[in-house]
Swiss-Prot record:
Keyword terms of this UniProt record: Cytoplasm, Hydrolase, Metal-binding, Nucleotide-binding
Top EC group: hydrolase
Main location (coarse class): cytoplasm
UniProt-listed Enzyme Commission number(s): 3.1.3.5
GO CC entries: cytoplasm
Cofactor descriptive note: Binds 1 divalent metal cation per subunit.
Binding site for a divalent metal cation: 10-11, 43, 97
Compartments in which it is found: Cytoplasm
Superkingdom, natural source: Bacteria
Gene: surE
Protein name: 5'-nucleotidase SurE
A matching Pfam family: SurE
An annotated Gene Ontology molecular function: metal ion binding
Substrates-to-products reaction catalysed: a ribonucleoside 5'-phosphate + H2O = a ribonucleoside + phosphate
Amino acid sequence: MRYKILVTNDDGYEAKGLRALVKALKELEDVEVMVVAPASEKSACGHSLTLVRPLRFVGVDDNFFKLDDGTPSDCVYLALSTIYVDSKPDLLISGINRGSNMGEDITYSGTAAGAMEGVLHDVPSIAISQVMDFSDPQGDFTLAQKVIKELVIKIKNGSFPLPQREFLNVNIPPDLDSTDNRDAKMVVTYAGYRFYANDSHIHRNPRGEEFYWLGLHPLDFLPREGIKGISDYEAIEAGNISITPIQLDMSAYKSMNKLKEWIE
């Protein structure tokens, strides 16, 4: 029986990273790939579902659909409820995203949200992102393809390494052709603290009306005290592959007793 993999992303069905992922997966033996991806780019859409308008599947190719006009979470939700009626896929992969998804950026990420939706439905899931070298805006996904194939083979021949409602968040370092990254190794990391700064830009149209563009602040992270290991950001800075276990439970357990005392 073939190993079934559901694929989605947040860059849209025409994205180079998605095509690179599908190509890599189809090179594996006994694997069946189904793609359901947004009809347009949904970067930073978070874990949103579309509840205010209808959605429809549009066939692009064999086992390849775009969802007009849905989010990654919509894609996974509807794929699991309409395509995989009799049995769930063995694995879900969201990506390959163009750009990193590290630290608190995970909460914005449509790529991570695709994996979140998967584990909500008890489907083992991976989110994979390619950290970009902006001197090469098109990106090179060769290393990401190699990594995802290694992970899928390991999972397919063994088991998924995480419990329910946890997914793997994978970030791939840039500069594939550099000496530093040829020997990139997989490193288990924690999610770093992202440093954010206001990067909104005001403009005026020909009628003098104001409008805004939200910019992307450069990757910058704050140190975390009392945490053993290294962060996703530190692994990438060292030219390594970051693999972070992410859980959906956002409860702040360390603060519960303090909160009880405060309430009493």
